[in-house]
UniProtKB/Swiss-Prot annotation:
Primary location recorded for the protein, binned into one broad class: cytoplasm
Record-level GO BP terms: diaminopimelate biosynthetic process; lysine biosynthetic process via diaminopimelate
Active site residues per record: 158, 162
Protein name: 4-hydroxy-tetrahydrodipicolinate reductase
Subcellular localization: Cytoplasm
Binding of (S)-2,3,4,5-tetrahydrodipicolinate, residues: 159, 168-169
GO MF terms held by the record: 4-hydroxy-tetrahydrodipicolinate reductase; NAD binding; NADP binding; oxidoreductase activity, acting on CH or CH2 groups, NAD or NADP as acceptor
Gene label: dapB
EC class of the enzyme, as a word: oxidoreductase
PANTHER family in the cross-refs: 4-HYDROXY-TETRAHYDRODIPICOLINATE REDUCTASE 1, CHLOROPLASTIC-RELATED, DIHYDRODIPICOLINATE REDUCTASE
Residues that coordinate or bind NADP(+): 38
């Protein structure tokens, strides 16, 4: 037995799933308690080490999330919205900290996480890296300092496998800019321009998405006025930064009161 928190990774076969597994295995502060994949996946029933092309680790991939969560201390979840909602209920029942990096969730889907946060620690963020969360804070401060003579645009780039746009990080940055200006993002968001769109509406916050190659993640927040521009930028070159941040959140959540938290809370920013 060990006093290290046991971590379950969902979506084990995905890019982030495998990176999370490696991060937990490399950590001296946590242990891998379980791995989950969807029903019917080729990995189900295999030892995760062998499934990932290495030596056996004694942890078998399961499609029974409830059983995997039982006895674990945290779940790290980078999957899909409906899966995350289901996992949130199971994590709450098991008393596991639930760290959510799933993106592409609608406001209605996010609201479905609220009941779980009444019973356990739920940490959700569109991006788990320290650098991006610092960028969020900077964006809020710059937006608050500048008036609407500065147009705000959020430009993001990701690999060609990414299925949602704008990215969760781009939306975090847009929310920060809107908060800095004291407005609701939903009222000023401009997510698509094509054809004869007319002049840019003053006060809008625009979004542009690029998809190509193996780009891990790049985000620019542009403040553009007549005669000058300010650009705040973050470039991720290794998705390990997201895995390290997620593990940090899982460890931070141990012993905390039930509730909904984000990486700003985890990092104390």
């Amino acid at each position: 037995m060990t006093d290290k928190p046991g971590i379950v990774i969902t979506g084990a076969s995905g890019r982030m799933g495998q990176m999370l597994i490696k991060t937990v295995l490399d950590s001296d502060k946590a242990e891998l308690a379980g791995v989950v994949e969807r029903e019917g996946h080729d990995w189900v029933g295999q030892d995760i080490g062998i499934a990932m092309g290495g030596a056996a680790l004694g942890v078998v991939v399961t499609d029974d999330a409830g059983s995997a969560f039982a006895g674990a201390q945290a779940v790290i979840d980078f999957t899909a919205p409906q899966a995350t909602i289901a996992f949130s209920k199971l994590a709450a029942e098991a008393g596991c900290v639930h760290v959510i990096g799933t993106t592409g969730m609608s406001e209605a889907e996010i609201a479905q996480l609220d009941p779980a946060a009444q019973d356990t620690v739920l940490v959700r963020a569109g991006n788990m890296s320290l650098g991006v969360n610092l960028l969020v804070q900077l964006t809020k401060k710059v937006a608050a300092a500048l008036d609407e003579d500065f147009d705000i645009e959020v430009i993001e780039a990701h690999h060609h496998h990414k299925v949602d746009a704008p990215s969760g990080t781009a939306l975090m940055l847009g929310e920060a800019a809107a908060e800095g200006r004291g407005v609701a993002l939903a009222e000023v968001s401009d997510r698509g321009r094509d054809g004869i769109t007319g002049a840019r509406k003053k006060g809008d916050i625009g979004f542009s998405a690029i998809r190509g190659g193996d780009i891990v993640g790049e985000h620019d927040v542009l403040f553009a006025a007549a005669g000058e521009r300010i650009v705040l930028r973050h470039m991720a070159t290794d998705r390990a930064i997201f895995a390290r941040g997620a593990l940090k959140a899982a460890l931070w959540g141990q012993g905390k009161d039930a509730g909904a938290y984000d990486m700003i809370d985890v990092l104390g920013l």
